[in-house]
Amino acid sequence: MQNRNTFFGVKQQITRFISVSIGIYVITQTSISNAYPIFAQQGYENPREATGRIVCANCHLASKPVDIEVPQSVLPDTVFEAVVRIPYDTQVKQVLANGKKGGLNVGAVLILPEGFELAPPDRISPELKEKIGNISFQSYSPTKKNILVIGPVPGQKYREIVFPILSPDPATSKDVHFLKYPIYVGGNRGRGQIYPDGSKSNNTVYNATSAGVVSKIVRKEKKGYEIIITDPSDGREVVDIIPPGPELLVSEGESIKLDQLLTSNPNVGGFGQGDAEIVLQDPSRVQGLLFFLASVVLAQIFLVLKKKQFEKVQLFEMNF
């Protein structure tokens, strides 16, 4: 009986260990693969503030360019491309969470007009699938299918991201009209400087939290530094903790001021936002325009023929 209980206890411990290990793995992988979109999705109902600012800029403090290209106009119920370009120098390396250097990832958020959404797979042509590559898009939330997010994905391969978009049809959706609509985009390259809870990442600059003398610098194995700042007037000590990644700019015995830079700024990435306009074109207007252009061309042809006929009559009368 005792052996049976012992075996059962060992079995329970093994099962618990496996469950915890799987849980940690899943959480870790999820946080790595979905870091950029999740930060915005968890904290903001809408990624674009009333001021027009996209919330990704709250964590990615450096400003970098981003570009978007869409057709000037589209017909209803049509699949088209929205191309987002996130340029950066692929030779540069960023500071990773463990303090080592690595390549930059990119991420993007595309804010479409109401009614526009990600094209279903069966509507995407093979040519467009080849342009998209091996990446997947997701809606910002179940109620906001017009807002698409992606990332992080390797920047070396996806500095240009092609979104397959399906235009709405006013005939089936009463809230959609044949108008000119704005499209907004935000794109980042590299890690952010601030986490959603307000704490700093190791991909930013660190400042002194007190004035005084750097009495000691303790290097923590794989954990950065502890900088001990002593106030000469009363001997009070303040410890500033620097994570692995940023390079120190101060040394022991150096006098420093409040907010003085303790490290360099390791950030090589940044965030940018842009916009474009697209017209949802009424097919009947297009047909009317084509009919008008055809009428103009025919009128010109008849005018030329009439002119030549008149010239022939004049020439005949002169000869007669």
Swiss-Prot record:
Gene3D superfamilies from the UniProt entry: 2.40.50.100, Cytochrome f large domain, Single helix bin
Gene Ontology terms: biological process: photosynthesis
InterPro entries xref list: Cyt-f_TM (IPR024058), Cyt_f (IPR002325), Cyt_f_lg_dom (IPR024094), Cyt_f_lg_dom_sf (IPR036826), Rudment_hybrid_motif (IPR011054)
Stretches that traverse the bilayer: 286-306
Compartments it resides in: Plastid, Chloroplast thylakoid membrane
Free-text cofactor note: Binds 1 heme group covalently.
GO cellular component: chloroplast thylakoid membrane
UniProt entry keywords in alphabetical sequence: Chloroplast, Electron transport, Heme, Iron, Membrane, Metal-binding, Photosynthesis, Plastid, Signal, Thylakoid, Transmembrane, Transmembrane helix, Transport
Similarity comment text for this entry: Belongs to the cytochrome f family.
Function per UniProt: Component of the cytochrome b6-f complex, which mediates electron transfer between photosystem II (PSII) and photosystem I (PSI), cyclic electron flow around PSI, and state transitions.
Name this protein carries in UniProt: Cytochrome f
